[in-house]
């Protein structure tokens, strides 16, 4: 497909999405929920064919030398498919927010003014590796009354095509236009350039992937962008804290799964608890094969314990390590003077995604919540909870690190906007 044909192709997708968006925006909640339930059933019924398509992607990606963490993201297990099927059913069970009027107040003139929640219209989703995003994005589009154009990574093209075909089938079975969810069927990068430059059809772009992708989209897009940046998440172990709880959380936040963007990449430890805490967590990390990139103070403490030093992979940290999203069994470790230095470090080096404090001090917890400039800030909980399902959103289309429109996990409400509605009884302005 040459550049001219790609431009025509994307214009066609845009027009079809815009037309479909008007129909799905006014669809009753029962119809949208029926489509979601249909999709959940189809995912379960087609498990074998979906995994066969995914296997073709995995084999091609492995032969091309795709890195281990990205291969992990590409894989569609039976558990992954059941999770997205359950997500569709959970969305179907959630209240429909479209048409909801909030903040209705009577003004001195007698008019009543409020805001109605309405669909955005058409969103374009650009994402890498994870084929389950196809279902997450499609299901949220359906529930929120939007249309969407999906452009997944070339490494997942077979998986995405198989999943998108089921979405279209579910929509048609429910009496909704199949074009409400469309997958860009070419892996040519020119399609991305076209998608982000169609303001006449696309109302917002949501890129989800590496920093290079996000920066390119943000720079070149001619429509608004909701950014899902990388996840350089931190856990800060405060003085005072419950050491046993801190060890449990720091272990889970890093090792429960390495590839998600909400996995912890940086561990900050208050000097007052470092001698008690660091040897315990280092023993766990060492047993699980986690490389520890330590500042001088942390390394000094760990080297003083021969039993740990003999099994642990302790490496001097560089300045770049404080910025790094590893997506791998690697963690940076730094000893800090206290909560203020921890906050300053996080605000300087983090990606403003998710950061947690583990503490017994209420004032420290409140200061951390107020001053850490991240989309999700936690007290005494694992960063792995930064997820739409865990936050009760039913599903998420990404975790926005922006400060406008949507911040944190973007669920149904993040895919809507508010318009003012005015109710009068014949009032005129004097």
Curated annotation (Swiss-Prot):
Listed pathway(s): Amino-acid biosynthesis; L-proline biosynthesis; L-glutamate 5-semialdehyde from L-glutamate: step 2/2
Reaction it catalyzes: L-glutamate 5-semialdehyde + phosphate + NADP(+) = L-glutamyl 5-phosphate + NADPH + H(+)
Entry's Gene Ontology BP terms: L-proline biosynthetic process
UniProt-recorded Gene Ontology molecular function terms: glutamate-5-semialdehyde dehydrogenase activity; NADP binding
Main location class: cytoplasm
InterPro entries: Ald_DH/histidinol_DH (IPR016161), Ald_DH_C (IPR016163), Ald_DH_N (IPR016162), Aldehyde_DH_dom (IPR015590), G-glutamylP_reductase_CS (IPR020593), Glu-5-SA_DH (IPR012134), GPR_dom (IPR000965)
Signal peptide span: none
EC class name: oxidoreductase
Source organism superkingdom: Bacteria
Compartments, as annotated in UniProt: Cytoplasm
EC code: 1.2.1.41
Keyword Transmembrane appears in the UniProt entry: no
UniProt keyword list: Amino-acid biosynthesis, Cytoplasm, NADP, Oxidoreductase, Proline biosynthesis
One Gene Ontology CC term in the entry: cytoplasm
HAMAP family, alphabetized: ProA (MF_00412)
Record function comment: Catalyzes the NADPH-dependent reduction of L-glutamate 5-phosphate into L-glutamate 5-semialdehyde and phosphate. The product spontaneously undergoes cyclization to form 1-pyrroline-5-carboxylate.
Family affiliation: Belongs to the gamma-glutamyl phosphate reductase family.
Protein name from the UniProt record: Gamma-glutamyl phosphate reductase
Annotated organism of origin: Polaromonas naphthalenivorans (strain CJ2)
Classification of source organism: Bacteria, Pseudomonadati, Pseudomonadota, Betaproteobacteria, Burkholderiales
């Amino acid at each position: 497909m040459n550049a001219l044909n790609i431009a025509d192709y994307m214009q066609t997708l845009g027009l079809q999405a815009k037309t479909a968006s008007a129909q799905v925006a006014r669809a009753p909640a029962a119809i949208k929920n029926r489509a979601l339930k249909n999709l959940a059933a189809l995912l379960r019924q087609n498990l074998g064919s979906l995994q066969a398509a995914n296997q073709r992607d995995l084999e091609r990606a492995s032969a091309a030398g795709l890195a281990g963490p990205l291969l992990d993201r590409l894989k569609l297990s039976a558990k992954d498919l059941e999770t997205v099927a359950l997500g569709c059913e959970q969305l179907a069970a959630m209240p429909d927010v479209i048409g909801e009027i909030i903040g209705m107040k009577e003004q001195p003139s007698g008019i009543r003014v409020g805001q109605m929640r309405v669909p955005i219209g058409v969103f374009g989703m650009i994402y890498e590796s994870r084929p389950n995003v196809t279902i997450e994005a499609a299901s949220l589009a359906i529930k929120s009354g939007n249309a969407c154009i999906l452009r997944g990574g070339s490494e997942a093209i077979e998986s995405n095509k198989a999943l998108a075909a089921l979405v279209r089938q579910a929509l048609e079975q429910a009496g909704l236009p199949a074009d409400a969810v469309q997958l860009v069927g070419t892996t040519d990068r020119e399609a991305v350039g076209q998608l982000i430059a169609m303001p006449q059809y696309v109302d917002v772009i949501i890129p989800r992937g590496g920093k290079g992708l996000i920066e390119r989209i943000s720079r070149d897009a001619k429509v608004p962008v909701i950014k899902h940046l990388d996840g350089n998440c931190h856990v800060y172990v405060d003085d005072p804290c419950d050491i046993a709880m801190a060890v449990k959380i720091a272990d889970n936040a890093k090792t429960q799964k390495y590839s998600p963007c909400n996995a912890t990449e940086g561990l900050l430890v208050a000097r007052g608890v470092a001698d008690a805490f660091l040897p315990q967590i280092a023993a766990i990390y060492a047993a699980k094969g986690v490389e520890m990139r330590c500042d001088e103070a942390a390394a000094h403490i760990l080297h003083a314990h021969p039993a740990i030093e003999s099994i642990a992979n302790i490496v001097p940290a560089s300045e770049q390590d404080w910025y790094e999203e590893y997506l791998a069994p690697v963690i940076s470790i730094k000893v800090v003077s206290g909560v203020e230095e921890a906050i300053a470090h996080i605000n300087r080096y983090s990606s403003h995604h998710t950061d947690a404090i583990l503490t017994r001090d209420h004032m420290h917890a409140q200061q951390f919540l107020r001053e850490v400039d991240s989309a999700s800030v936690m007290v005494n909980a694992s960063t792995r909870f930064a997820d739409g399902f865990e936050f009760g959103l039913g599903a998420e289309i990404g975790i926005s690190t922006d400060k406008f429109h949507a911040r944190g996990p973007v669920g149904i409400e993040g895919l809507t906007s508010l318009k003012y509605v005015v109710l009068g009884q014949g009032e005129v302005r004097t």
